[in-house]
């Protein structure tokens, strides 16, 4: 699994801590971490939590990433931004139980975490434990396990409802403020990382017109 890490500007200084915790846990599982930044608070490209949602949607819908880990001060804003787009089901994860139940009950493809609220001494340990529960035990197996059939049925219903209520991502991108969109893909390593992994030629062609 290719896991993308995205940080917005208010918590960008923690990018290295988050990346280290994520890699420590998931690389031994065989997963790959791709860090899209922000990398530091003074990066030239400043991402807001709204732009985290835009970038996450581009990565997931294009196949450039299989999963996105992101967040903000509380994790709420980034979660709302990600869930504004088709092809993204983002959970709010504060602790390992959140991580495990989201993976097995909701079976989404992104999480948003609080990187300021409650992030004190031992914060990196909580990240590691969350990532272990999120990525170490599979997905969609139900919790409790005897509830797996109705839970996955509800997940399929949610997918159908979202398919009916969202328009294709490229139409979403064409409809939003183009300066906002350009800012979301302005990271110093975006082009290098994205085009090497993008599987959607139409989306890639559109993104190239914005760079």
Give the positions of each predicted feature.
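Short Gly/Thr/Asp-enriched flexible loops that form oxyanion-binding sites at enzyme active sites
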Residues: 77-90, 94-97
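Short glycine/serine/threonine-rich phosphate/pyrophosphate-binding segments
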Residues: 14-15, 53, 75-81
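Short, solvent-exposed amphipathic alpha-helices that sit
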Residues: 14-29
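C-terminal binding/interaction regions
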Residues: 4-17, 100-210
């Amino acid at each position: 699994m290719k896991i993308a890490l995205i940080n917005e500007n208010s918590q960008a200084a923690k990018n290295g801590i988050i990346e280290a915790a994520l890699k420590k846990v998931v690389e031994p599982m065989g997963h790959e971490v791709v860090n899209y930044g922000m990398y530091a608070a003074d990066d030239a490209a400043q991402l807001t939590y709204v732009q985290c949602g835009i970038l996450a949607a581009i990565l997931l819908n294009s196949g450039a990433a299989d999963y996105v880990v992101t967040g903000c001060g509380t994790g709420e804003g980034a979660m709302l931004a990600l869930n504004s787009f088709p092809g993204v089901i983002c959970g709010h994860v504060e602790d390992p139980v959140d991580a495990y139940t989201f993976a097995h009950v909701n079976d989404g493809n992104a999480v948003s975490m609080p990187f300021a609220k409650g992030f004190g001494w031992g914060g990196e340990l909580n990240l590691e434990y969350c990532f272990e529960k999120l990525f170490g035990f599979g997905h969609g197996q139900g919790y409790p396990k005897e509830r797996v059939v109705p839970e996955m049925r509800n997940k399929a219903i949610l997918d159908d409802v979202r398919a009916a209520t969202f328009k294709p991502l490229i139409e979403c991108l064409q409809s939003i403020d183009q300066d906002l969109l350009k800012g979301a893909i302005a990271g110093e390593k975006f082009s290098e990382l994205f085009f090497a992994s993008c599987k959607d030629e139409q989306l890639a062609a559109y993104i190239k017109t914005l760079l």
